[in-house]
């Protein structure tokens, strides 16, 4: 692949994107980053399967796995990774949820550091695409988690309204 030139502007944009994807927009509330969203979730909520298959904890563990693979060996061919194990069963209690969040925060910081320490100058297309892919991937999972949380809120409201209606009938 032909190397591209990493400008300071592109480097700054990628670092800003890291901050947005994981932290969100702190000055407005239109987007909560992945870590900001996960810090509002407790271990019970993270373990609950709302749609009957995936949980918030599984999404978080999957993103952690993917970031760790990239941060540890960014030149590793994607086909050499057993991506299926990233969706393994995740048993969460308060301690393991706190550990998962701590590890995920560390990997997000490693990605931002990687972007920040890239030297301006030649950058392989593969490396650039890998960074952009990780940011897009984490943003996708932030959105998936947001949908799980909204659906869970909807279910809780629907159940609460149903209980209120039942009380009226009694």
What is each PLM-predicted segment?
Residues 1-28, 35, 43-86, 121-170:
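Short, contiguous alpha-helical
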Residues 88-139:
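Acidic/histidine-rich alpha-helical segments that form the ligand environment
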């Amino acid at each position: 692949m032909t190397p591209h030139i990493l400008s300071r502007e592109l480097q700054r944009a990628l670092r800003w994107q890291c901050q947005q994807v994981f932290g969100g927009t702190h000055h407005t509330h239109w987007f909560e980053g992945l870590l900001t969203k996960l810090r509002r979730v407790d271990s019970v909520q993270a373990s609950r399967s709302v749609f009957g298959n995936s949980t918030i904890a599984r999404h978080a563990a999957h993103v952690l796995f993917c970031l760790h693979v990239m941060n540890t060996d960014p030149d590793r061919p994607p086909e050499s990774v057993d991506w299926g194990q990233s969706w393994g069963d995740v048993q969460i209690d308060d301690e393991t949820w706190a550990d998962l969040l701590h590890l995920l925060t560390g990997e997000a910081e490693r990605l931002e550091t990687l972007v920040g320490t890239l030297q301006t100058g030649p950058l392989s297309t593969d490396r650039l695409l890998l960074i952009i892919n990780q940011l897009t991937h984490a943003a996708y999972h932030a959105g998936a988690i947001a949908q799980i949380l909204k659906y869970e809120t909807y279910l809780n409201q629907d159940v609460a309204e149903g209980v209120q209606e039942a009380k009226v009938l009694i």
